[in-house]
Amino acid sequence: MSKKSVLITSLMLFSMFFGAGNLIFPPMLGLSAGTNYLPAILGFLATSVLLPVLAIIAVVLSGENVKDMASRGGKIFGLVFPIAAYLSIGAFYALPRTGAVSYSTAVGVDNALYSGLFNFVFFAVALALSWNPNGIADKLGKWLTPALLTLIVVLVVLSVAKLDGTPGEPSSAYAQQPAGAGLLEGYMTMDAIAALAFGIVVISAFKYQKVNKVRTATVVSAFIAGILLALVYLGLGSIGQVVNGEFADGTAILNYAALSTMGQAGRIMFVAILILACMTTAVGLISATSEFFNSLLPGVKYHVWATVFALISFGVATMGLDTVLAVAAPVISFIYPSAITLVFLSLIEPLLFRLKWTYLFGIWTAVVWALFMSIPALNPFIEWAPLHSMSLGWVVPVLVASAIGLAIDWNKKGAQSVAKKESISV
């Protein structure tokens, strides 16, 4: 297992995770949490870093892609879930969002023609960079990610050194339950779904590099990428700790920090950071979705899928960020409970045994609960659940359902063991 290959692939994975949302969430958390920053950021890291890392490991333990994982939930779930996951974080949401966010920050003019031209160039470059799936690790890991990290480090160091703001009183939820608020904020990045998708890219990269222990290398890369994410989040969060005033979001905080410390050059650097973050994520998403659908329908080549997804993303992004969010956010919210359930069941399975009924009970409870959460008219039927107000009402029902399934699996295993012993004695 080459250390160089692992490092380059780790940098690639970091850059694919680190999109626009990952850039702007931590500074706002740093500002809002105030003096309660430490528990808030630790909660944030638990769901925005640890959960995606565990998702990558779950993919490795289950096979080579999310379809191998999802098959444990039955044939229907095994087909529908991965398709929904790849489309929602791909061409119908996260992918066009990379272009829309880049345009709104870099240009910010409400003009359909300008938006169309910008997004055309953006997705043309992303398509070109993802055209050869075997070369993505080098393009992202060797060049784009080091450039992105360098710019982020410069912004963080100058901001912390030059800005003289002090942490204020924690606002809203951060005053009462800072760790819980941070946990929920990290949960809302929904990076666990992206992790399920990116697993196939990491595994393919190591296979192309002829790495012997692909599974081990993938797990190590996931941990290294996670450590990098955590360090960057801590740095960005610290910027929120040294600014004072009212800011609409993390973008405004970072823009202020860049202008205050470096003037107009800082503004240019911030735009470069955001576009690089969005571009590396776009390349990863095009590659991941195209590889998955190529494996699903081998008759349609990777390059055809890549072109189709880039064109769809261009069209959706040109319609604007609000359109992207309105269309895809409900879908993401619907499949996320199932994704997390799938990840944790895949992680505990090697410690126990084949969990047929545990998977079926747990996953389908998550699906049904998410359906009730997605339809406002059905919400009154589930408001009694613990954590419902935090959009986590599905957690306890899924745990109970999984425990029932585990009891059935355990009972069946015991019955099979008895039957086997009796047949041997006869």
Swiss-Prot record:
An individual GO BP term: L-leucine transport
Superkingdom of source: Bacteria
Gene Ontology, cellular component aspect: plasma membrane
Phenotypic effect of disruption: Deletion mutant shows a considerably lower isoleucine uptake rate as compared to the wild-type strain.
Record-annotated membrane-spanning stretches: 11-31, 41-61, 76-96, 111-131, 140-160, 186-206, 219-239, 268-288, 296-316, 324-344, 358-378, 390-410
Molecular-function GO terms, alphabetical: L-isoleucine transmembrane transporter activity; L-leucine transmembrane transporter activity; L-valine transmembrane transporter activity
Main location per the UniProt record: membrane
Membrane protein topology class: Multi-pass membrane protein
Alphabetically ordered keywords of this record: Amino-acid transport, Cell membrane, Membrane, Transmembrane, Transmembrane helix, Transport
Localization (cell): Cell membrane
General function of this protein: Branched chain amino acid transport system, which transports isoleucine.
Family: Belongs to the branched chain amino acid transporter family.
Protein name (record): Branched-chain amino acid permease BrnQ
Provenance organism: Corynebacterium glutamicum (strain ATCC 13032 / DSM 20300 / JCM 1318 / BCRC 11384 / CCUG 27702 / LMG 3730 / NBRC 12168 / NCIMB 10025 / NRRL B-2784 / 534)
Name of the encoding gene: brnQ
